[in-house]
Amino acid sequence: MAAALRFCLLLSALFVAGGAFAAPADLVEQGRRIYTEGISVSGQPLQASRDGGAILSGPQAACIGCHRASGMGSVEGSQPVSPIGQRYLFATVGDLVMANMDGRRGKTLNQTHAPYTDEGLAMALRQGVGISGRSLSTVMPHFVLDEQDLAAIKAYLQQLSAGYSPGVSKEVIRFATVITPDVSEARRAVFKTMLQSALTAKNSSTSPRKRYMSSAASFATQTERRWDVQVWELTGEAQTWGAQLEAHYREWPVFALLSGISDTTWAPVDAFCAAQKVPCWFPSVAVPSTGDAAYGLYFSRGVALDARVLASYLQDANGEAAPKRLLQVQGGGSAELAARSFGQSLMVKGRTVQTITVDSDVAKGRNELRAALQSARPGDAMALWLSAEQLRWLDGIQPPAGVQFYASASLAQLGTPQWIAPSWKPVLQVVYPYALPQARQANLAYLHSWLKLRNIPLVDEVLQSELFFSLNLMTDTLQDMLDNLYRDYLIERTEDMLGRREASKVEQENRDRITLGRLGREAVLAEGVRGGAVGDATSPLAAQQRAFGLGESGGTTVYPHLSLGPTQRFASRGAYIVRFSQGNIDTLTAQSDWIVP
């Protein structure tokens, strides 16, 4: 990383005159390999040296480590790394653009600079001498570059982030949101209602007559844009979704897929995003990407995370809590991934898991589930990888005594209250990737207020919290990006700012709650009396009241904490094991600490 920083610092000083040009594709590709892989045109590792005699080679010398794929820079330790994309590195004198490499500092204009000649560029890269004749940073390595290497890296940099990504114009940013055919009508309807309400408010605030100053930099540079969002509702089998997405995209290219919702697989959507290099922005899905998710940003790994958390929990159990046998029942679809992840995680630990598959047909599946439950013996642990509908099959089946039973909140949508057979509530434990109830209510006070003001019903708290967060985070990130609207940069800014943004939002909301608690408590309670909602523990007003009493929240979503880092794609990485309280069968109580497998 230090070596990459040295190359980054060198390139940060190179500002070359001229606009983008069409270099031969093979030359640009050779430059890409130098930039991203540290491989010279000859195919050999890029070589460099620095003061003290240290030799740098190959990936150590590649600048992508700190300038990132967008060329928009970053921060390494306390050292900001300047942008080197076409608009920055090759800007002419007086062509000033603004960027924000370090979220801890203010946004800054790029430096006014004289254009670099080819000779000046070569001297800077090879000898560490800038166009002014002054030596560049002492940590700058001197690169071994022949004329072909110099031509290639220049060609690559001249096209890097040279113009807006597809879906962006001076006035508008295009988005799409994807809904897969398996989503219930109730969830589909509230998702679309919330999206439309938020979109109307967003575009109203950025209209010329109603524009407000979201930030001094964005106001001064007039970089606020109207959002244009299409809803792409897929049909048919999952193997046809890729072609449907490609057809939508050909007709209407978008900057990113904004949120989205699916109750089964998301793999075709993630594959489309990777192929087209379109960011997939925090969709509400039980099964996100099963691959590298190069262009996907997700809340968590979904059911796969639940499975790994449960495997870790059971593996660490000691004494009487340690299960004699491990069994799992899977109901098909998303449950197959959970069962596979659970089995693989325990296999690594030397444990075997007996897997029982139940049919999707209600009558047949229920009989198979009954038989599977009867096969369990005292001291066993059984994971029930079942959907919310399949969990209802437990009604009328008595749980075998002495068996530990576990369900997945992600798979069975238990983040929102679901009906569970009364005889099962005392024995069923749940892998719960969300904040515990008290903290969760404080975290979601703003969401509940937003819904109440717009008369939008609370249908699925997890889904609605995720959509609310996704829309707000996109707004904040675009404000931070200003006019540098490149897809890679959208992902990079989110990797860098998410954790800090969450901490800042929490602090702001806690201050607001204190103020409201002092000035508005009586008014809120009076409104509740008039509206008859004070006694309703699920009402938005009750959530506000609990927030006042709780004081500080720890996040802004249903998740305890969200953060990302370079190349990280899943913002929440753990879960609790919870069970229904004995004293209050509708209250969840933690059985474990936050488990990160």
Describe every region a protein language model picked out.
Residues 296-300, 394-469:
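Extracellular/periplasmic periplasmic-binding protein-like sensory domains
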Residues 170-172, 187-193, 205-291, 360-363, ...:
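Beta-alpha junction/loop-to-helix N-cap segments that form part of ligand/metal-binding clefts
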Residues 24, 30, 115-131, 141-166:
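C-terminal capping alpha-helices of c-type cytochrome domains
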Residues 48-118, 139-145:
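Gly/Gly-Pro-rich "capping" loops immediately C-terminal to redox-active cysteine motifs
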Residues 450-465, 475-589:
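Segments of small-molecule ligand-sensing domains
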Residues 22-57, 110:
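Electrostatic cytochrome c docking/interface patches
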Residues 36-39, 65-72, 126-130, 158-159:
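Detector for the c-type heme attachment site
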Residues 251-356, 402-430:
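Extracytoplasmic ligand/sensor domains, especially the bilobed periplasmic-binding protein
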